[in-house]
């Protein structure tokens, strides 16, 4: 017997079976950057319609975590898929570089500004630290395979960006949105600074819960309001609070104008309580017997005076809609210096905004003898005892509740009224315009719209000033006496911005006001405050996108961040853009969930369930990480664990194996000379190209909708089901045994070439390294990189009006599935070994029989059997297997007759009829020594 291996067209490719991504990817990255790949893409896409995904800047502090990886990979998938869709989609990554976390890190090494180092030295150290952090994070982001302008990212500490941030504030002032006020703001005692809404986190805390009695100044007048004939003892209005330390700042008591309040006689005094709260209060304070002396609505008690328990002033009753009956007494202790609602009602009634608390959280001198200099939280017990001594404490208990904490220090914060600068939500209609703009944006998922609408509708004015060292200065001058802004503020801010553009923010602190305004400087002082870092990042649609030429003056199309950014970057960006330009900075806003472990738990070092992206890349490669991100429905929580990543690695192997099979079977194929015209191709090859077209339509639509898990599912279905379990299986015989350059094989190779040309493009946005690797093994002339290409436009499909259309092949696949079941059973029964040892008879009804017989002799190639016949359904023997899924089909199997051909392994009766190839079947003789077999259908 001869060795016929040399006569077969065995698959051959240098494309490795194993990805070895962790080893290979760094070399590919090096080539990308040596070749300046990002510049190559920009050049290739020049002049096309732009799509701008504006990067929300991560904070330049610490190593990247798995959440950063999810975010950057999602962005990269979008940018690359937009490039494939024919857009010029530049991607400029950015970093948020000012602010408190960096100050803290620098303080740990060189001390606080003004102590061991000057403020200027401190800022220089902060700038240096931030630059180092950017470089570390940048290396990790690049390793993820994210393509962008890494040589020229935007940093909020770039001199030009710092200058543009000042200009952004100038435009907002010019539009009338800025005002100054001593409003209560979130204040961190450790930071000694105001905090933004997005810098506040809520944790459980135990606080003293107290009911306090304020005695009526004019008992008779109050008694008359209730129409009470006789009251035994003083009349007290009872408030409830969990912040005893705010009692020194109490200036009023709020009642709801429409709630009913009762005067209730208890032993030795009468209490005023909301009618609906009497029972719960009495139960709480342990009173079992009381008498109701009268009822009035809250409005009737307006401006009645009640004596502060330990200070000399009288607290009037004020009316507010913010009073609820959810807890307490229905009477709200009101300290305008320590609460937003209290402040609003204080403004309405012209009540003093008292703030007896210093920046470090201790009471200022002159507050009260036993309180001066005491930390507010430590003062709680002192105040409780003081109230007890004065006979004003009705009840004390401990309350476990959710309380605001500083995001950085994880310590409780307070509301504290300080002179601050605010962007007003209402004085120039910013709130109304923002709500209008929200409706014109596409929010993905769509619940994001209601979420940000609610936040904008209910948010207070934005406190944009901070008492920090490392930040962009507000660059304002105020009059020494009136504290009014300089009338030429906008002109002065531009002059400051020009200096900052040259020398950075230090230029502001080095500036002598006389240089800008001459003798007028004697009447003005420089505002020492810096801007909230959310102003820095929120203004980047102006300071970066408008300023950089590669964006061509276009507004951003998409912002993509975690779902916490509705109150963070999405909010600050919306406020600033609307305040500056009257319009939203984005057309689409897409949010992703947070990473959790395989059990749905939040990741934390204490639980030991964190997954490091660096470890994953070093072990499995970035493409596995990228495939995991794409495979996940990121609209909710994103689960990651070793097991989940292993599943992604398994999916990757299936896709890689498909690509390798395609490449290996394109050996010796040159599309310029060997490609077969569509109309001359074998029908099943045309069908396979059509399946690729259908898959591409679905995949492109899913990329367009940002449904990347749908992309992966469709890709897997195409590779594993449509190709792997059918087409790639049935073509092996023709591919390996047909004449090398005959039409039967070239038709097949043409289909494989079309398919892999499409497949490599589908993969490129997600499995970028592997797509680049495949690209290098594809036959034919092509661009240097797949990333400059567009979706493959060479695909075509079978026409529906043809007998052998998609519906025909779909039914044939079902028939093949039923035949496979019968073969598997025969193998289990040891009647046959492989499927080529079998010959089948398909007993079919007339309609199905017509379809099956149209394949003629080629039916057996579809079924992968040595013989296949079609017979009348009615004549089926008793042992024929009835199909459960294909109507009008029974299947009988017998062992194939004849001898096994050593070349093609088919069983046939025509072996030995050619003297030169005595042990070969007739078909193989034709393929080896003749003109090659003819195939029309399969």
Curated annotation (Swiss-Prot):
Coiled coil: none annotated. Zn(2+) binds at residues 901, 904, 921, 924. A motif ('KMSKS' region) lies at residues 602-606. Its cofactor is Zn(2+). It is found in: Cytoplasm. GO terms for biological process: isoleucyl-tRNA aminoacylation. IleRS has two distinct active sites: one for aminoacylation and one for editing. The misactivated valine is translocated from the active site to the editing site, which sterically excludes the correctly activated isoleucine. The single editing site contains two valyl binding pockets, one specific for each substrate (Val-AMP or Val-tRNA(Ile)). GO terms for molecular function: aminoacyl-tRNA deacylase activity; ATP binding; isoleucine-tRNA ligase activity; tRNA binding; zinc ion binding. InterPro entries: aa-tRNA-synth_I_CS (IPR001412), aa-tRNA-synth_Ia (IPR002300), Anticodon_Ile_BEm (IPR033708), Ile-tRNA-ligase (IPR002301), Ile-tRNA-ligase_type1 (IPR023585), Ile-tRNA_ligase (IPR050081), M/V/L/I-tRNA-synth_anticd-bd (IPR013155), Rossmann-like_a/b/a_fold (IPR014729). Catalyzes the attachment of isoleucine to tRNA(Ile). As IleRS can inadvertently accommodate and process structurally similar amino acids such as valine, to avoid such errors it has two additional distinct tRNA(Ile)-dependent editing activities. One activity is designated as 'pretransfer' editing and involves the hydrolysis of activated Val-AMP. The other activity is designated 'posttransfer' editing and involves deacylation of mischarged Val-tRNA(Ile). It is an enzyme of class 6 (ligase). Keywords: Aminoacyl-tRNA synthetase, ATP-binding, Cytoplasm, Ligase, Metal-binding, Nucleotide-binding, Protein biosynthesis, Zinc. ATP binds at residue 605. It comes from the Bacteria. A motif ('HIGH' region) lies at residues 58-68. HAMAP family: Ile_tRNA_synth_type1. This is Isoleucine--tRNA ligase. Binds 1 zinc ion per subunit.
């Amino acid at each position: 017997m001869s060795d016929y291996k040399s006569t077969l067209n065995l698959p051959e490719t240098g494309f490795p079976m194993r990805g070895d991504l962790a080893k290979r990817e760094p070399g590919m990255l090096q080539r990308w950057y040596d070749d300046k790949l990002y510049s190559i893409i920009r050049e290739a896409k020049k002049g096309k319609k732009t799509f701008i995904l504006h990067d929300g800047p991560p904070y330049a502090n610490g190593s990247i975590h798995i959440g950063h990886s999810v975010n950057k990979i999602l962005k990269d998938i979008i940018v690359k898929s937009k490039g494939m869709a024919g857009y010029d989609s530049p991607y400029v990554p950015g970093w948020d570089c000012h602010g408190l976390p960096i100050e803290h890190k620098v303080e740990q090494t060189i001390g606080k500004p003004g102590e061991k180092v000057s403020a200027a030295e401190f800022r220089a150290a902060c700038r240096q630290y931030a630059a180092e952090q950017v470089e570390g994070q940048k290396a990790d982001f690049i390793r993820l395979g994210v393509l962008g302008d890494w040589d020229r990212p935007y940093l909020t500490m770039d001199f030009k960006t710092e200058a543009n941030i000042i200009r952004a504030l100038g435009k907002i002032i010019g539009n009338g949105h800025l005002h100054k006020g001593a409003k209560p703001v979130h204040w961190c005692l450790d930071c000694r600074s105001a905090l933004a809404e997005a810098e506040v986190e809520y944790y459980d805390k135990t606080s003293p819960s107290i009911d306090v009695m304020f005695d009526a100044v004019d008992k008779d007048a109050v008694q008359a309001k209730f129409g009470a004939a006789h009251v035994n003892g003083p009349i007290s209005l009872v408030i409830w609070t969990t912040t005893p330390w705010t009692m020194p700042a109490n200036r009023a008591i709020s009642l709801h104008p429409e709630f009913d309040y009762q005067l209730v006689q208890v032993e030795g005094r009468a209490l005023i309580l909301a009618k609906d709260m009497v029972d719960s209060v009495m139960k709480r304070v342990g009173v079992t017997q009381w008498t109701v002396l009268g009822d009035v609505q809250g409005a009737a008690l307006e401006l009645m005076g009640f004596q502060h328990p330990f200070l000399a002033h009288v607290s009037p009753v004020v009316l507010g809609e913010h009073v609820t009956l959810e807890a307490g007494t229905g009477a709200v202790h009101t300290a305008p210096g320590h609460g937003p609602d209290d402040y609003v009602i204080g403004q309405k009634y012209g009540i003093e905004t008292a703030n007896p608390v210093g920046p470090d959280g201790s009471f200022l001198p002159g507050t009260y003898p036993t309180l001066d200099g005491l930390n507010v939280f430590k003062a709680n017990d002192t105040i409780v005892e003081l109230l007890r001594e004065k006979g004003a404490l009705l009840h004390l208990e401990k309350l476990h509740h959710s309380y605001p904490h500083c995001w950085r220090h994880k310590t409780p914060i307070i509301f504290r009224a300080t002179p601050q600068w605010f962007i007003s939500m209402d004085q120039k209609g910013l709130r109304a315009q923002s709500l209008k703009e929200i409706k014109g944006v596409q929010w993905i998922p769509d619940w994001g719209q209601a979420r940000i609408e609610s936040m904008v509708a209910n948010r207070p004015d934005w406190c944009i000033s901070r008492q920090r060292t490392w930040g962009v200065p507000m660059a304002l001058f105020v009059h020494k006496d009136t504290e009014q802004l300089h009338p030429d503020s906008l002109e002065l801010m531009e002059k400051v911005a020009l200096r900052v553009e040259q020398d950075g923010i230090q230029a502001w602190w080095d500036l002598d006001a006389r240089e800008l305004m001459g003798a007028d400087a004697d009447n003005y002082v420089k505002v020492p405050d810096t801007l909230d870092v959310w102003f820095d990042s929120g203004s980047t649609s102006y300071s970066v996108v408008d300023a950089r030429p590669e964006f061509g003056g276009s507004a951003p199309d998409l912002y993509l961040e975690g779902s916490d950014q509705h109150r963070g970057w999405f909010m600050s960006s919306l406020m600033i853009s609307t305040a500056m330009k009257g319009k939203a900075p984005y057309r689409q806003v897409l949010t992703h969930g947070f990473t959790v472990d395989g059990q749905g738990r939040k990741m934390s070092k204490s639980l030991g369930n964190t997954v490091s992206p660096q470890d994953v890349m070093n072990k499995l490669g970035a493409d596995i990480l990228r495939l995991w991100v794409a495979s996940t429905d990121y609209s909710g929580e994103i689960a990651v664990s070793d097991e989940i990543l292993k599943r992604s690695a398994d999916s990757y192997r299936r896709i890689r194996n498909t690509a390798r099979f395609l490449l290996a079977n394109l050996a010796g194929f040159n599309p310029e000379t060997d490609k077969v015209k569509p109309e001359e191709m074998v029908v099943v090859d045309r069908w396979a190209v059509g399946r690729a077209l259908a898959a591409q339509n679905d995949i492109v639509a899913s990329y367009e909708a940002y449904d990347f898990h749908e992309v992966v599912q469709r890709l897997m279905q195409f590779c594993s089901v449509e190709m792997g379990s059918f087409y790639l299986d049935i073509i092996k015989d023709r591919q390996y045994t047909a004449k090398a350059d005959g039409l039967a094989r070239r038709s097949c190779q043409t289909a494989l070439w079309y398919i892999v040309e499409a497949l490599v493009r589908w993969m490129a946005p997600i499995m970028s390294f592997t797509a680049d690797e495949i690209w290098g093994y594809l036959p034919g002339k092509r661009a240097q990189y797949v990333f400059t290409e567009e979706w493959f436009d060479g695909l075509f499909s079978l026409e529906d009006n043809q007998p052998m259309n998609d519906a025909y092949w779909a039914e044939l696949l079902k028939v093949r599935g039923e035949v496979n079941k019968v073969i598997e059973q025969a193998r289990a029964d040891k009647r046959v070994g492989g499927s080529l040892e079998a010959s089948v008879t398909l007993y079919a009804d007339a309609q199905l029989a017509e379809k099956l017989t149209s394949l003629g002799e080629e039916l057996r190639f579809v079924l992968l059997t040595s013989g296949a016949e079609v017979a009348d359904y009615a004549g089926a023997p008793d042992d024929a297997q009835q199909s459960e899924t294909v109507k009008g089909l029974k299947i009988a199997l017998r062992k194939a007759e004849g001898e096994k051909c050593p070349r093609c392994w088919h069983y046939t009766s025509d072996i030995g009829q050619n003297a030169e190839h005595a042990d070969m079947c007739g078909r193989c003789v034709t393929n080896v020594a003749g003109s090659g077999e003819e195939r029309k259908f399969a």
